[in-house]
């Protein structure tokens, strides 16, 4: 394989922009599949890249299936990424290992909310991109408008490389503005490309658009600028070089168009991928040297150097765990010994394969820059594999925090075992899916990037792991505390024949206001009124009493306890007697110390178009939010607020519907704060009602 010709590309888009259909056509024209199936087609086959049963049913792409194709002797690895906001980690993951991308846009809807999110991710990983304006056959198609939106909404220097021949139901082909030729796609499935002269009624428009294209490209090539200014003909190769230079420098976004569904324009888009998107040689990648203070090391596309590879996706295959790997340096071959830099464990490379959606092709080795898959390797997503002579780690992928939680409960013993297996699998596969058991409520809580994200996992539990589960709302982790000082003087006495129990503890409790501490114990006992060996028993008893408050049954925090007096009995006093005395003393004083309830307060950040700023403020105010800051950056707004966690459930859905899906939010724990009296009363009533029942 000529690695200078290799292209690692992703296809990113808003949901329903026709991205999976485009990928399907690419597979067909590259002879990887021999029949075309629609995403939600009548034949029940579904798109080839949507290999998970659930994806085919919903008609949305969930897992980024990888496939290897060849176009005119250029090897291309394609990662098909999900277009729904809830699957953002899949997009982030694939962009991490890509060298270039195709941004697919709907010719009617144009730049949509997820296009903005995807573009932000492409920028985060400095991925050069081409734009493909799809669905030019749709009613209301306007590719020129989409090209303008790329500038106004995404701030991309978009340049038309083609114009359409007809739109809506009259869309029959495209005009190439570089070659100044018209292209039609005929024969069954558009496999016959017919090159003709530009129709006379479109010639003037084509000339005018070519002028604009050359003006834009002149910034990237001095020779082109001179020839264009002198009114001379610019050679095709110079135009291609200028386009490639601008694209690789992330200063240009060439725009192509067509209709994947109607088989128009796909082959010319593939030509553009090979011409304008980078090979692994064109991209700088770095690793951190763990043996040298995490010093940044430049990696080289060279098969002779020590191997460095990144595991970027895990799947359960029929032969065990399938690990997708991008090779950044050196080679991967069967039988090779590597080390996982996170665990320091050595392993041997077993079966090495190339993927075509969910079909596999065994290979002997993969070279620098390639994307391959391994079977039977124990690892987590994001792990780095390297030659044992070095200890490098690829910089970690940006992983957004989960924003929604749900409690899950297995319906029976078999489901409980299967659910445990499923949760173990999912957390390994997806770093944005988290799970834990809430110690206080004993519920299993799952967390993710949105309702659909968690729904898909609950469905997968049922289908793949045969785990029947019920879902509910998770409980907020409240706390209790006191608001004033209170004294205690409590005697624990149990004398009913035989060994008795006796212990008296006196002192006071007060609110503790110390950063990072929730409990403090002070011993002011003098003259041995409580023997030294029983002081730890008192401490233990107070801490035991704080495990469950009397208001709503949650742990008690932020209390300082001081003991200054007491009494013991030479026979009946014991460790347990003083523990019980301390528990009694605590409860006696707690009621007098005016206890209250604390709730988790989250730092919430909303980002979205300025036109929705009012909606964002409104949503936060409705949720007892306190706005702490806002920032306007042209058409984009950022709002920061402190909001109680209990008000944030279901927020992603509400935010999406009130901002047309154009705003995003992140949330992290900030501190505990006192609940208002109305909430206090509600929580008390709920707790008392539960205890009665």
UniProtKB/Swiss-Prot annotation:
Primary location class: cytoplasm
Transmembrane regions listed in the UniProt entry: none
InterPro entries: EFG_II, EFG_III, EFG_III/V, EFG_IV, EFG_V-like, EFTu-like_2, G_TR_CS, P-loop_NTPase
Pfam families referenced in this protein's UniProt entry, alphabetically: EFG_C (PF00679), EFG_III (PF14492), EFG_IV (PF03764), GTP_EFTU (PF00009), GTP_EFTU_D2 (PF03144)
Subcellular locations according to the entry: Cytoplasm
GO MF, one example: GTPase activity
GO cellular component entries: cytosol
Gene3D superfamilies, A to Z: 3.30.230.10, 3.30.70.240, Elongation Factor G (Translational Gtpase), domain 3, P-loop containing nucleotide triphosphate hydrolases, Translation factors
PROSITE patterns named among the record's database cross-references: G_TR_1, G_TR_2
Top-rank lineage group of the source organism: Bacteria
Residue intervals of the tr-type G domain: 4-281
Residues annotated for GTP binding in this entry: 13-20, 80-84, 134-137
Keyword Transcription among record annotations: no
Keyword set, alphabetical order: Cytoplasm, Elongation factor, GTP-binding, Nucleotide-binding, Protein biosynthesis
Xref: SMART domains: EFG_C, EFG_IV
Function according to Swiss-Prot or TrEMBL: Catalyzes the GTP-dependent ribosomal translocation step during translation elongation. During this step, the ribosome changes from the pre-translocational (PRE) to the post-translocational (POST) state as the newly formed A-site-bound peptidyl-tRNA and P-site-bound deacylated tRNA move to the P and E sites, respectively. Catalyzes the coordinated movement of the two tRNA molecules, the mRNA and conformational changes in the ribosome.
Sequence similarity: Belongs to the TRAFAC class translation factor GTPase superfamily. Classic translation factor GTPase family. EF-G/EF-2 subfamily.
Protein name: Elongation factor G 1
Source species: Borreliella burgdorferi (strain ATCC 35210 / DSM 4680 / CIP 102532 / B31) (Borrelia burgdorferi)
Taxonomic classification: Bacteria, Pseudomonadati, Spirochaetota, Spirochaetia, Spirochaetales
Designated gene of the protein: fusA
